[in-house]
């Protein structure tokens, strides 16, 4: 749902799938950067349907990712978000790391200690 990296004034919504990560296909875009005050309480939301993932911050739509309904979906794995599949919702504060090519880069000791507080997580099934 959200990833916050290195005390930036933004969060990221990112789709991690075989299609976007392993095959490195970025069409449609698999990520969005959204400015928000990370020191405030923020409400992050995700609406998931068979056709689209829609992300929100504080009630405002900030990003969407559509199901391309590829003919070779079994191979490409662009849309693993089916009701029969399991997947992870990520709420992440990325401090950095030593892994080569790490998105967050090395850990900056000036940002330590770091705290991420989560007040609640709610999952609701929408009736159709």
PLM regions and their residue ranges:
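GH16 jelly-roll
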Residues: 1-128
